[in-house]
C-alpha cells in the first residue's frame, strides 16, 4: 500500500495511446489483504477525485471488512496528487461487513452521498438465495465537506424497501457511481435476487434470478424510493442520463448478464425501464462481470492531431442526441481479461457501440468511470494485474480523442 502523497498520470495531449499510464491506488498486500470493487467520483467544484474500494482480508466476498478511500487533487498540469488511504469507519455496523460502494454527488447542496450494503457476518450471497433469508441492509453515509468528514451510517432498508424485502433473497447497489439527472433526481443503481416462487418457505431452486432497478430521490437526498425491476435477468448495473436532440431525458441502464450485457431505457427517470434487451456488441464472460457506463455531452467536433488542422477538426455532431456514452468492461469472451472502452455515438440505438479500445492487456475485473466536464477528460478505476485482476486497483485519465484512436491499446 502506498503512503503519503503520489502523483498520478495526466491524459495524453497528442492522442498517442502509448503515453497513457496507470497509477496504482490500492495494491494487494503480502498478508493477504486485498482491495476490490472500485468506485470513483469527481467533485468538479474543488477539482477532487474520491476513489473508494472494499478492504478484504482475502479475495473472498465473505472476507470484506470495511470501505477505504483515497483523495486525489487535480493539478493545473493535469496530474493528480493522491493522499494516503483512509478507512471509512462511520460506514459500518457492528457484526456486518461493508460492501459495494456507490457514491453520488448532489450539486445543489454540495452533499456527497455514499451508498453501500452491510451483510450480516459471513453470510454468502449463495446462502441467502438458497434459504430465501435476506441478511443484507441498505445503508448510506453523507458528507457536506467533500469527503473530509462523514455522517454516521443510516440504515434505509425499512424506509426504502419495506415489506418487499421478504421477496428479495439479497440485493446490492451498483457497484460504482450513481448519477444526478438534469431535473435534480438522484439515481442509485441497484439489483436484487428476486424470489418469484416459494415452497415450504424456501425459494424454488433456479427461480431466484437477479433483476436491476433504481433507487431514487426527488428531494435532493432527503428521502429515497425504489423503482420497478427490469423484466429481464440483469445483475450489477450502472446508469447514465441521455439527452436527446429535443432536450428530453432518457435514463439508460447497463447491467451484468451472461454472454452479453443487458440494456434498458427509462422514460420516467428510473421509475421503471422499458424493453430490456441484450447488447450483442458488448460481450460478457459466461458468469459475467461488472462494468461501468457514463454519459457525457456529445462534441461538435474533435480536433485533429496535427496543429495545422486543429482549427477545423472532424465534425461529429450526433443527429439524434446531445449525449454520448462510454462503457468500460473486460473484452475477452472467455475470461476477465483485456479491459476495453466502448464508445456509443447514438445511444438511443442498441447497435450504436463502436469496437473497444483496449486499456489493459491482461487480467481485468471491475471498474468505474468519471467525467471532468471542465477539461473534457475521463478518468477510471480498474481492477487489473499481470497474473490476476485482484493484484491492484489502478487509476488512469484519458481524452475522447484517445478513445477514438485506431491504435492497438493505451497501455500494455
Residues covered by each model-derived region:
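Asp-box/BNR beta-propeller blade signature and adjacent active/binding-site loops
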Residues: 2-412
